[in-house]
UniProtKB/Swiss-Prot annotation:
Membrane-spanning ranges: 11-31, 32-52, 88-108
GO terms of biological process kind: proton transmembrane transport
One cellular-component annotation, GO: plasma membrane
Keywords: Cell membrane, CF(0), Hydrogen ion transport, Ion transport, Membrane, Transmembrane, Transmembrane helix, Transport
Protein name per Swiss-Prot or TrEMBL: ATP synthase protein I
Free-text function comment from the UniProt entry: A possible function for this protein is to guide the assembly of the membrane sector of the ATPase enzyme complex.
Mode of membrane association: Multi-pass membrane protein
Alphabetized Pfam families for the sequence: CGL160_C (PF24763)
Location of this chain's protein in the cell: Cell membrane
Organism, scientific name: Nostoc sp. (strain PCC 7120 / SAG 25.82 / UTEX 2576)
Main location (coarse class): membrane
UniProt cross-references to InterPro entries, sorted A to Z: CGL160/ATPI_dom
Family: Belongs to the bacterial AtpI family.
């Protein structure tokens, strides 16, 4: 279980660093409004990642399958963005997907750079 917590902390850290880099880049190249929309989506993605980690942690002990209530978080955010004129759907959605970029970075790092056999096991 210690390995799970270590992986979770690493994924959250990478997500936060990636969020900061992208937020500053979007602010420089676009506008503060779009950057804040991205940041809102990225923060929602971190909350989603935390909810997913809690579900995975309970898997096997208390539950037999993962819950699907996490998706309500994204749906509520997209509905809010579509109703409120200050929010833009695309930057929020792309911000939400930042945690997916973190997973890609982690998989590439483990598969190609690290000598760790975590993902190479059949």
């Amino acid at each position: 279980m210690q390995e799970f917590y270590q992986l979770y902390q690493e994924l959250v850290l990478i997500t936060l660093v990636l969020t900061g880099v992208v937020f500053i880049s979007v602010w420089i190249f676009y506008s503060l409004n779009i950057a804040l929309n991205y940041l809102l989506g990225a923060c929602t993605g971190v909350v989603y990642l935390r909810m997913l980690a809690k579900d995975v942690e309970r898997l096997g002990r208390e539950k037999q399958s993962l819950s699907k209530t996490r998706l309500a978080l994204l749906m509520a955010l997209i509905l809010l963005a579509s109703r409120w004129n200050q929010l833009q759907i695309m930057p929020i959605f792309l911000g939400f997907l930042t945690y997916k970029a973190t997973l890609i970075i982690y998989v590439v790092r483990v598969a190609f750079i690290s000598d760790s056999p975590k993902l190479r096991q059949p």
